[in-house]
Amino acid sequence: LFVCMAIGAQTVFKNEEVEVSLLKEKTWVFSTWDYTTMYLIEGEDKAVLIDTGTRCADLDKIVGQITGKPLEVIVTHMHPDHAGCIKYFDKVWMHRADTVLVPQHAADYQGEFLYMEEGQVFDLGGRKLEVAWMPGHTPGSVVLLDKANGDCYSGDAFGSGEVWLQCVPMSPIATFHESCCRMEKLMKEGHIKDIWCGHYPYLKSSLPLAYIQTMIRISHRLMNGDQEGSEPYSNYFIKMPPTARKLAEGRAMIVYDSTNIPEAR
């Protein structure tokens, strides 16, 4: 069932659905078959699993082979590619604002949802993760801040090259813009250096400050009704409405719904 090995220098586990690699000390990245990502963060006393992927059989057992520490499970948002395997865990942390998505994506979950608050700190022993609410992609999207090490684990809050803001229920573009501005401030103040995104296999690297600043520019245009240069957006796996569009600058792109854009000012 499981294959635990050292493949190359970094891989510590691999099967048909997931590959687990050491990202940095006591931090592992889980790259799944459909290019989604989980992160396992270990402290001296406890560990945290950030997101649970789409489909990864016996995820709890895989995690248990890597760390024997008591585990907290956090989902950055309630989309099925990040909360698809919560069934393997008795308790899962989420933001209350994403409960609107539970009937659609997690109605069969038999465990207990615990609700994170802005500024809540998970103390793992010698390592802390702070919750920051960053709505936009979903109403309850959060990121986890490891300020001591300069790391942010962002789920889909800022995308992985492209961010989806057309997902229902849609938030105003200004909401995403405000989240990006807050992230920029954290990075400029030196609290965060690297943003580790929710679809790491597409990039194989962290997102820098320049990426967030580009997202700020694009979202500022859209929230003021400027769609010049936008194009229709389609996705091979998920059917998009005819109103789905994309606006890109460099390596950053916002996917949005044209009905959610105000008239140009």
Model-flagged regions — what are they?
Residues 1-5:
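Sec-dependent N-terminal signal peptides
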Residues 8-10, 181-265:
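Accessory terminal helices/loops
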Residues 11-18, 22-24, 90-139, 147-149, ...:
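Metallo-beta-lactamase
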Residues 14-65, 144-156:
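Conserved beta-strand hairpin/beta-sheet module of binuclear metal-dependent hydrolase folds
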Residues 37, 55-58, 78-85, 100-101, ...:
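Active-site environment of divalent metal-dependent phosphoester hydrolases
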Residues 50-53, 70-81, 93-95, 133-136, ...:
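Active-site neighborhood of phospho(di)ester-bond hydrolases with catalytic His/Asp-centered motifs
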Residues 55-124, 128, 160, 217-224:
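Active-site HxH/HxHxD metal-binding segment of metal-dependent hydrolases
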